[in-house]
């Protein structure tokens, strides 16, 4: 159905139970597991917002690693997740190593950085949602079903550094522990944002098992380009419109190694809701940690169409 219409899929048998007026709102077939399904909209008027954004609003109830960051409060970022790789230890036993962050944006889908899947010969096998302590024995890991890189991403470049991870199990409901973030779709003014991750708390330091957060300020791409020379392999065109930069003017706080794939977020209040968290960027690249050089993030609003089409198609 059109991008901002809500609807359902019906089997041919279910379609016959609809009234004539309801059938008028149906068009297009798809095949799922060899079963033909018919797409029908619920109403004739489009939603006020795009489907991906409206579904996020519907899911919310009305009314930490980062250089020099602070530990996030329990359940403060229920949309935060970690991607886990299966590794074999020297003694032959297997365990899970969490190496990249991700953000839950739907019942089965998460956003992360595409470059995360090139750190080793293997792909991640599980997702740990909810911003849990990575050493927790009570947290639940969810098996990964599919990884979808942006079709224009080319490693080791920094352009189009975005991917969607789909898990096998569907979250039937959101809770205060595990919930989704909304996907930002508008231009972003220069403002304060929050970076979240499990990376190193200082350059060349050890990673943190606790979720960390830090406040940064977005800057213009023009200012950001003053800190980065064009690199034929990584930044051949400099910092472009599909990227976002953020820094700490005190040169203390920053995203660091291990934060890759984690979100850059802003929070806004809208009518009827106490607070909505939006992912505006994905941690992609930086020079050192806490050096004063801005970090580079994938600008989410530039990929809204691709995210929506990938999830709902």
Segments predicted by a language model, with ranges:
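Short, structured beta-strand segments at or near domain termini in extracellular proteins/domains
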Residues: 35-41, 163-166, 300-310
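Sequence contexts marking disulfide-bonded cysteines in secreted/extracellular proteins
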Residues: 1, 25-31, 38-44, 53-59, ...
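Active-site substrate-binding loop(s) of clan PA
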Residues: 148-154, 169-215
């Amino acid at each position: 159905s059109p991008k901002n219409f809500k609807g359902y899929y019906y089997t041919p048998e279910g379609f016959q139970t609809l009234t004539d007026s309801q059938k008028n709102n149906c068009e297009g077939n798809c095949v799922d597991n060899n079963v033909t399904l018919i797409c029908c909209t619920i109403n004739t008027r489009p939603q006020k917002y795009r489907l991906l954004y409206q579904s996020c609003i519907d899911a919310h109830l009305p009314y930490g690693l980062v250089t020099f960051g602070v530990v996030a409060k329990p359940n403060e970022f229920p949309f935060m997740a970690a991607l886990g790789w299966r590794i074999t230890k020297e003694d032959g036993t297997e365990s899970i190593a969490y190496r990249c962050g991700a953000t839950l944006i739907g019942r089965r889908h998460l956003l992360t950085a595409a470059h995360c899947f090139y750190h080793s010969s293997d792909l991640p096998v599980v997702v740990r949602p909810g911003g849990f302590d990575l050493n927790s024995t009570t947290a639940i890991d969810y098996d990964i079903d599919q990884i979808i890189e942006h079709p224009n991403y080319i490693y080791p470049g920094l352009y189009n550094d975005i991917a969607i991870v789909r898990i096998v199990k569907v979250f039937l409901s959101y809770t205060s522990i595990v919930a989704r973030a909304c996907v930002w779709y508008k231009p972003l003014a220069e403002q304060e944002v929050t970076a979240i991750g499990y990376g190193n708390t200082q350059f060349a330091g050890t990673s943190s098992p606790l979720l960390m957060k830090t406040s940064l300020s977005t800057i213009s791409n023009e200012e950001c380009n003053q800190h980065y020379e064009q690199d034929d392999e990584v930044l051949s065109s400099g910092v472009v419109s599909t990227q976002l930069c953020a820094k700490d003017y005190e040169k203390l706080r920053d995203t660091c190694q291990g934060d890759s794939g984690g979100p850059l977020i802003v929070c806004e209040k809208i009518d009827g809701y106490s607070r909505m968290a939006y992912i505006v960027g994905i941690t992609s690249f930086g020079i050192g940690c806490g050096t004063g050089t801005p970090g580079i993030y994938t600008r989410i609003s530039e990929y809204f169409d691709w995210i929506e089409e990938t999830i709902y198609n």
